[in-house]
Amino acid sequence: MSELDDMTTVTERPAAFSLDGQEVEFIAGETIIQAATRAGRYIPHLCWHPEFAPHGSCRVCTVKVNGRSGAACTVRAAAGQAVESDTVELNAHRKTLLQMLFVEGNHFCPSCEKSGDCLLQATAYEMGMEGPRFEQFYPSRPVDASHPDILLDFNRCILCELCVRASAEVDRKNVFAIGGHGIHTRLLVNSESGQLGDTDMTLGDRAASICPVGTILPKRRGFAIPIGQRRFDLQPVSKQPQPDGGAK
């Protein structure tokens, strides 16, 4: 028997970081939120989706990595990192961001078709938000009902750009875009009229089903599932089995 055969094989431990004091293993190249989600750990988020590259616009997934703030959807996991997410400070920061989103748009949950299936609403509940903290903007935004199968309600848009990315990267149609600056930033429809009905978007497009809020809705299905029996009515966002806990 050779010396090599007689040697005890040492199995290397997978690379890992700590998330709120608990070890999370990761695959090389994964971001913190990817590794955490794969391990069944919830980090609040709105614009992140596992099907797409990180966007980093909502900042709801902000965590502290070795004491420094960073977006969990863009920061790569590394061995030995000490990541904090579920802290009083970070949750207060997230709650403030959510309160700002609610007043910047027109989000009226009791009458919204998306209630109980809305990631914004579910995340607000998760963060303990009970009402607006800031003065409502009440912006004047249109509702586009020009498409035979899809309703487009700009009042609820949170500028996550998931529909923009889905239409461009999956559907290969580029139906949506973002225009404007500051508080005037808005979702645009890429047609001469600016109407969704003048695009080639269909109900089967990924962009038609990925909206985490109530901006893009299929017509004639609004209350097919009664309020009280919807996804987030039955189970909070932090306990959801979906890989992103949000948009399907």
Outline where the language-model segments fall.
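Terminal leader/tail segments of proteins
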Residues: 2-12, 16
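N-terminal cofactor/phosphate-binding cores enriched in small/glycine residues
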Residues: 23-78
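A short beta-strand micro-motif
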Residues: 16-19, 63
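Short, well-ordered turn and helix-capping elements at secondary-structure junctions
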Residues: 21-23, 191
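Fe-S ferredoxin-like electron-transfer domains
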Residues: 3-4, 59-63, 68-248
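Aromatic-flanked redox-active Cys/Sec active sites in thiol-based oxidoreductases
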Residues: 21, 49, 152-155
